[in-house]
């Protein structure tokens, strides 16, 4: 069985500045755009401030 694992840490300033829901939505929309354009799983997820906050794995 194949699966996608998305891990996102919500402990930094970007999530406090715009709210957890807003920042999660922005990150997931960005990931979705990358998938739609090239079926390319981003390995690293970045917050609004350019910090690494998560990973995507395809198994």
Sequence positions of predicted segments:
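N-terminal acidic leader/helix
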Residues: 1-29
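Acidic, low-complexity, intrinsically disordered interaction modules
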Residues: 36-38
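Short, mixed-charge low-complexity intrinsically disordered segments
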Residues: 40-59
